[in-house]
Structures are given as structure tokens and as C-alpha cells.
């Protein structure tokens, strides 16, 4: 029996980007475990990846191209050959381009894989085709906009520096579910006596590893940050020398903004008692190395960018930015280690085509004109359940005149609406290059098993489509490994000093940031820009979240057992999650005459979704929580939480507002 242990990388949209060891027996992955030699993840995996082989070799894997034979959404298909599938797609597209123009075609993708090649494989093809462009802003562009408004391109601290902190604030992040390896440094700091706080909208699993949890009203986090700054200034718990040398706009903030954020006012906005706010400010102001870990969820409100901007400004007042073990950790841009324009190939565009925001797919499919969307090509995403305003998305996908192609591993809800379904490889079956937004490691991954069935990678499919569409550019004739080799042949400052020998062996290797990178503030002024004259609001301020007419704020939160809609094919994980729950405070449930375990319906102006009610004191009054995105076949009413979320965008960054919606709840 041929047993081999091979290295790979977790491909999913998670900051941890774990190193994997895959046990392969006779060409089949039989076990997946963590790579103990990975510098950051150190051999541990989340429950989703611990049995990744069950996803890779699932009996539900798509193994052949399929053509629709029934109504859209019915899931009725017949097998066809790859040759026939590619031929049909190319013929349909050529006809559409002749009749409507190339902008009638829209690609839709996001981070189904984070590999630099396979994730971005469609960009050069669709640029060359002249298709409509997709504004890929569904996750956290508002967080990036908020950070950049203050810090520019200044890098965040290394996540392992958390071990050197004496106060760690997990602000708007359920780290156990979404960033579990960051907790390694948190636990080390706690052993040394550091205090650990969680600021969130409800008691999450992460509450179990912190010293204290502070629950705030959804969308009010910016007010809390301003209130803390008000008290730091009032009590002179600020670093005057650091402010004078490194901060632009402190005096303006002090005079024009902070006087309006006394504890009593902040208490009304956040729901925290004034005394608690004062205690938080004293502890933060007296800490020697306070570190804030900012979660992406904070940015998924109408005021998301401003909220992040305000929180990121807070450490500047106490001189925490630039000191080891302190400051603010948002994300790390390690993709800058590679010249990605060599993969994107924007130079293939003959003109800039229209840009369509992916959060407004429902609007695009149903209302866009001149031309209307006539074809949708979906890869690395499942918009039927992950895009907001689900009813509008499904309405658009149901259009008989919409030619939809879906490249997928499973018969997802989106695939059920496709005209052509193409089987996709898993990360263990293709080559790619990985970096992380949660640590500084980069790693090259080779296939560890052959493709399952007739599945093909993103790059292989786009190469076939390029040939079918008559593209002559040599670029499309390369392999994924050719593209990786090309990226590695171009030196960049971020890769200086990289351990090339270890990297070539397929192991994760850390990028080496200059020691002074965090105090060379990469902004136009060279300072932390609390005052940013280029922003619509030059100073950080409090912008309220969107108001709704319904009594409960809906938190569409992440699940411990899934990653958005990924892993929903796994019955073992679904059994652990048990059901599609809606969490509600006991007092609210009592006022409505509702009991735990009963069928309920959450509803608003966009739609209604059945849930099983879970009554728990972990959720504050006037808030309800729905964790995870379920496939519709597992949802009690054939709808999931995004039937209740709006297509509205954030204040900056044009991001999603998944956390900024209101609902009411009734008995089911």
C-alpha cells in the first residue's frame, strides 16, 4: 500500500491560512491534519478542516459537466462532455456579444479559494472578453477603507505580538469561529497576566476565553471608541510626545468631536452603563501595551468604514501604534509580496467596462439595462445564498433568458439554477500560491491527488474558454505552475530575505518586514492621520447605522461549523449545528409569547425566513442572531438568512451591510 504524507494549504477565506499535512494512500486523501512546522498555525486545525478529506472525496462531488434538462432551480441535469460544454458556452457568448455587446456577460466570484492563481484566474479572461466587471466588495472593503483613512499603507503588528500585550481587546470578532490561531498569542498573554476583553453584540463562543465581555448595541462601536478617547483626554491618559511627533489632527479631534461623547451620551448610544465606560477607559489608558484585534463584522454596517476609522484612531492617543504587542491589528496585506498585475492582466482590456457591485446582484439581474445581463458565470462563490436580498437574487437566477454557467464542486443552490455546470477541483487537486491576511506566511502548494472525476481547476477552464473564444495571447496557453514560476521570478521588497530553500520544499515561510515598518507611517503626511482632509468627514465622528422599521436588530453572524455556505455538504458538521436557529433574549421571547424550540418566522420588507427559536440570555434585548448560511435544501422554509439582508452599501468602500438590518419575529 503506497502511503505518502504531502504538504498543502487550507484554501478558504480565513485569516489563518493553515498549513496542512495530507496522508495519501493509493492516490486518495485519507487523512488531513495540521502541519506542526507551520510558523503560525503550528499543527492545529479548526473542526471544518480536521476532516477535509470527507469534503474532497464526498459522494456529493460533481464529477462530470452537466446540462440543465428541467426548470431552473429544479436540479435536473444530464451529463455532457467537456468538449460539448465549452463549445456551447463559447457559441452562446459569441451570439450574445454580437447582439448585445460583451458587457451583457457578468462574472461572479469571490474567495471560494484564496490561492493567488485559481482565485484570480478569471480576471484576464473576462478583461480580454470585454465583459462587465465585478466590484468584489462583499467581505470587508469598509474595514480596509477605515484603516487606510488613518494609517494609509502602514502594516499591522505581527499577530504573535499579542503574547507581549498586557491588555487585548477582541473587538467585534468571534475569534474561536473565525481566527482561532490568533488566540495562541492571546492565551500566552493571559498566562503572563494580561487582561482579555471581548466587545461584541452578543455572547459568542469567544466569551469563554476572555476575562470580560462588553455587549454594545449593533453599530454603536464608533461611539464607544469616541467615548473612550474623550475620557483619555479628560484624565490626561494620553501620550503627548507620541501625539506631537506622529499624529495629525489630535487638537481638532479634541476640540470639535470629543466634547459630544461624554459617558452619559455614549451610554445612551451603546447600552453600556457610564461607570463601565469609565472603567474601560481607565484600564485602557493605564495599560502599557494595549492591543485591539478588529473584526471584519464591525465594517458590515452602513457606518462600517467610519467605525473602523474611529477604533483605529484610539491607540494613537496612548502611543500604542508602533510599539510591539500594542496598537491595532486589522489585517496584513501579504499579497504585495507578488506582482499580481502579472496575473490580473488589466492590459487586456481595450476599454474600461461597467463596474457592477457584487452586493447588488439582485438589482443587476433584474433591473440593469443597456445591456441587461444575459449571461452569468459563477466560480468560487454561491450567490444564491451568500449574496444579500436573496429573493431578488433567486428571481434573477430564475430568468429563462439568463444563460448561467456555474463551476463548482457540489450541486449548490446556485448550481441548481445553472444551464451548464462544470465540475471543479478541490485545493488538493491543483497548483496554487498562498498568502494570508492574518499572518505573514507564504506557501506554494502542488496537487497531492489527481482531480476527482473529470473536474478541472479554474485556470484550466479559462484556458479552454480562451481557446474556444479564439484568444491568441500566449498568456492563456500557460499552466498554473508557469504562472506561479513567473510570479516568483519577479523580486519584490516584501520577499527580501525569504528562506528560498524552505519555500522551495513546499513549506510555509514568513515574510520579513523591516523592524521600523510600523513607525514609518505610510500616509501622505507621514503621520497617523486622525485628521484626513481627503475624506468626506475630515475627522472621525459617529455616524449612526441604518435605521429600520422593525423592532429587532438582526445579526447574521458566522457559524463555528461552516464558512458562509462552504462545508454545508458535510453531514457531520450539520449534525453538530443541529438546526437553523434564531437566538432571542428570554425577555423578548416572553413578551411575544414565544418559547424555545418552537417554529418562528423572522420577517421584514425583503422577505421572511423560518427558524427554530433558541431562547438564551447570551443575546441582549432587541437583538436576534442567526449564525451561518444554510443551503436551501437544509433550510426549513427554503430560504436562509440573506433573504432578510439588504443590498445597501457601506459609507466607504461600497461594502456589504449584512449586520445592519431589522426584523420582526412571529410564531411559525
What is each residue range found by the language model?
Residues 245-248, 327-338, 478-491, 606:
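A glycine-rich phosphate-binding loop feature that marks nucleotide/adenosyl-phosphate handling sites
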Residues 159, 428-451, 466:
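Glycine/threonine-rich phosphate-binding loop and adjacent beta-strand/alpha-helix elements that clamp
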Residues 1-235, 246, 253, 273-274, ...:
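N-terminal export/assembly segments and adjacent metallocofactor-ligating motifs
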Residues 209-216, 425, 440-452, 573:
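Short beta-alpha connecting loops at secondary-structure transitions
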Residues 117-187, 192-199, 222-226, 312-417, ...:
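Extended redox/cofactor-interaction regions of prokaryotic respiratory oxidoreductases
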Residues 9, 15, 393, 398-403, ...:
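Phosphate/diphosphate-binding loops
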